[in-house]
C-alpha cells in the first residue's frame, strides 16, 4: 500500500500568521498539525505540541498568544515522504524518528498531502483477531494526578514525547490529558489573565482544569479494531487501557498501532528474557 492511498489534504498556514489563528484552524479543521508556508513553499510544520512548548516558555508566559507568530513556535526541520512510498516504510520512519506525521511532496517538492499516525491507525480497524493486550504499552507509563500543576504535566509530556497521558488517582483512571487540551488551556489563560499576573498565576492551573473527564476506555481483551475506532472517533491519539473498577493497566495509542503497521501488520515477538 502506498502513501497516496491514505494521505489527506494538507492544511496550510503562513509563517507570519498569529499563533492564535493556527490554534483556531487546528480546532475547526479537527487536525493536529498544519503545514507552514512562506510564499507557497514549505518551511515547517506546527502542531499542538509545538504550541504547548512555546506557550510554556517562561519569558513567553507574559505575552498574549495574540502577539505571537506561527514562526516562533513551528518546527522548521521537516522530514517529507513521497506519494509512492510504502506505508510500512513510512510507519517505520515515524517510529524510528519519533514523528507523529509528515508532509507528502512530489518530485518537484510541491506539497500534495499529509500523512500522520492517525491515517495509519485507521488501517488496523480490520484486524478484529488482534487484541489490545497484544499491542498496548504497559511499562514506563506516564500518568498524572488531577491536582498536579498543568505546567509540570506539560513538561513531563513534552520530555517523554507523549501526545497524551491518563489522569489517575490511586491507580484508577479519572480522565485523559492531551497536548491539545494543554495548548487550549494555556491559550485561554493567555487571553483571560492580564499580562502582569500571568507569571504567578500560571502555576495555579491544575490538570483537572484542562483534562477530559470520562474519556473513552480500552480493554485488554477487546480487538484493536474496536480500540482504534474508539480512539479515532473521539479524535484522540491515546486511550487508557483498564481492568476492573477502571484500574489502569496500560495505554494503547496511535504509536502502538503505527508500530504494528511498521511490523507489516504482525504482533511484535516478546523480547527474550535474560
Residue positions per predicted region:
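Tandem CBS (Bateman) regulatory domains
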Residues: 1-9, 47-78, 91, 111-143, ...
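The conserved cystathionine-beta-synthase
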Residues: 12-30, 37, 80-98, 105-106, ...
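A glycine-centered beta-loop-beta connector
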Residues: 26, 34-49, 94, 102-118, ...
Amino acid at each position: 500500500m502506498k502513501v497516496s492511498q491514505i494521505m489527506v489534504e494538507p492544511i496550510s498556514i503562513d509563517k507570519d500568521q498569529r499563533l492564535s489563528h493556527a490554534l483556531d484552524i487546528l480546532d475547526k479543521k479537527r487536525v493536529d498539525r498544519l503545514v507552514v508556508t512562506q510564499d507557497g513553499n514549505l518551511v515547517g510544520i506546527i502542531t499542538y505540541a509545538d504550541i504547548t512548548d512555546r506557550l510554556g516558555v517562561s519569558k513567553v508566559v507574559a505575552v498574549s498568544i495574540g502577539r505571537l507568530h506561527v514562526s516562533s513556535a513551528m518546527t522548521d526541520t521537516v522530514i517529507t515522504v513521497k506519494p509512492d512510498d510504502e506505508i510500512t516504510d513510512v510507519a517505520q520512519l515515524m517510529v524510528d524518528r519519533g514523528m507523529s506525521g509528515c508532509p507528502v511532496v512530489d518530485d518537484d517538492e510541491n506539497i500534495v498531502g499529509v500523512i500522520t499516525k492517525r491515517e495509519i491507525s485507521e488501517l488496523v480497524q480490520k484486524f478484529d483477531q488482534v487484541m489490545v493486550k497484544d499491542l498496548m504499552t504497559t511499562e514506563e507509563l506516564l500518568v498524572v494526578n488531577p491536582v498536579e500543576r498543568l505546567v509540570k504535566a506539560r513538561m513531563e509530556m513534552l520530555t517523554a514525547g507523549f501526545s497524551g497521558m491518563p489522569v489517575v488517582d490511586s491507580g484508577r483512571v479519572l480522565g485523559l490529558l492531551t497536548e491539545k487540551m494543554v495548548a487550549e488551556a494555556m491559550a485561554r489563560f493567555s487571553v483571560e489573565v492580564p499580562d502582569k499576573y500571568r507569571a504567578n498565576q500560571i502555576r495555579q492551573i491544575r490538570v483537572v482544569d484542562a483534562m477530559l473527564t470520562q474519556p473513552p476506555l480500552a480493554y485488554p481483551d477487546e480487538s484493536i479494531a474496536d480500540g482504534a475506532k474508539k480512539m479515532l472517533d473521539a479524535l484522540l491519539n491515546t486511550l487508557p487501557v483498564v481492568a476492573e473498577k477502571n484500574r489502569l493497566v496500560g495505554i494503547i495509542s496511535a504509536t502502538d498501532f503505527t508500530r504494528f503497521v511498521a511490523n507489516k501488520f504482525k504482533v511484535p515477538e516478546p523480547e527474550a528474557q535474560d
